[in-house]
């Protein structure tokens, strides 16, 4: 099966912080994604001028597609970039990983996610969407999905409901399975009713972390969260951090996978994205949910041990060896 993803095309600028004080000074909500404007970005740049930083490809769904490509899968990515250095950087990184890109170029600058990593590997985003903000229904054609079997969608896109509705309709018309990552608890909180419509009408597979699942369902019980989501779609997955992950088919039993112990968690930025890649890789190879969770966990375990989303060749060799042994 061939997999394509659609989401915000962003370049990450990563900052490693010794504590959380700077986050309050630049008015970013800890452990959440906040949309910023150009003036706000200018303030962030001014206040972080003496903080170590580096640039890497970002965007939740593009991370997942890169991970799938590294596992040898045929994958694609749809997004919108600017005709600028950041856009060329983004495109080149995806292509180098083996991802087929369908990138619409706009007049706006390529989007940037200022990503702050605090002790314990937690991350906070100040995101200037730039060109990604202008991805619209007119950019999406059914032809983009031809030849693919599954579409993985970024939950952040619900902030443009006309766009995500168009994406889902055209992908369904093309016969694709639809997978959705809820992406952010504050986005879910603001769009709870619309997410309910989207999932019940279009989505086959849902990924959520515990915070997102709580925002969507109103429940603090992970198993109740899982049942609620699974009632609306075919497969529900709730990620529980160091408590592992759970999944179920609609009306079926609950499967659980424990997290692997990691002595030094560096950065959780791409952990959920890599988990989704491992899960979808196994699922589209016909494996049971229990094994899908295990393979997702293998990838997430490696992801939290590096800063950013790029794993070394040695890490990919460990991943492939672990998958082969399961």
Question: What is the meaning of each model-derived region?
Answer:
Residues 95-110:
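A glycine-rich helix N-cap at a beta->alpha junction
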Residues 3-16, 26-34, 49-50, 193, ...:
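Conserved phosphate-binding/catalytic region of the ribokinase-like
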């Amino acid at each position: 099966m061939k997999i394509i993803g659609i989401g915000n095309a962003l370049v990450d600028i990563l900052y490693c912080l010794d504590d959380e004080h700077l986050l309050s000074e630049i008015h970013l909500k800890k452990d959440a994604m906040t949309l910023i404007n150009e003036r706000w970005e200018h303030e962030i740049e001014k206040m972080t001028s003496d903080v170590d930083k580096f640039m890497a490809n970002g965007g939740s769904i593009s991370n997942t597609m890169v991970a799938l490509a590294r596992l040898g899968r045929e994958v694609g990515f749809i997004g919108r970039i600017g005709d600028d250095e950041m856009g060329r950087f983004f495109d080149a990184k995806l292509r180098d990983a083996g991802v087929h890109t369908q990138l619409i170029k706009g007049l706006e600058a390529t989007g940037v996610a200022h990503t702050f990593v605090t002790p314990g590997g937690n991350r906070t985003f100040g995101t200037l969407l730039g060109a990604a903000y202008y991805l619209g229904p007119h950019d999406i054609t059914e032809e983009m999905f031809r030849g693919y079997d599954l579409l993985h969608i970024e939950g952040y896109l619900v902030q443009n409901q006309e766009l995500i509705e168009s994406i889902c309709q055209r992908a369904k018309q093309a016969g694709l399975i639809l997978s959705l990552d809820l992406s952010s608890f504050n986005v879910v909180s603001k769009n709870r009713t619309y997410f309910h419509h989207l999932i019940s009408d279009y989505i086959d597979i849902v990924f959520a972390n515990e915070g997102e699942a709580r925002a969507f369902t109103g429940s603090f019980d992970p198993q109740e969260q899982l049942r609620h989501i699974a009632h609306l779609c075919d497969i529900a997955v709730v990620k529980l951090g160091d408590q592992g992950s759970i999944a179920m088919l609609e009306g079926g039993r609950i499967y659980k996978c424990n997290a692997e112990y990691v002595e030094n968690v560096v950065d959780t930025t791409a952990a959920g994205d890599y988990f989704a890649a491992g899960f979808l890789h196994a699922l589209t190879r016909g494996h049971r949910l229990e094994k899908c969770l295990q393979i997702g966990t293998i990838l997430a375990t490696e992801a939290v041990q590096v800063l950013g989303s790029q794993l070394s060749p040695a890490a990919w060799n460990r991943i492939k060896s672990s998958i082969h042994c399961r």
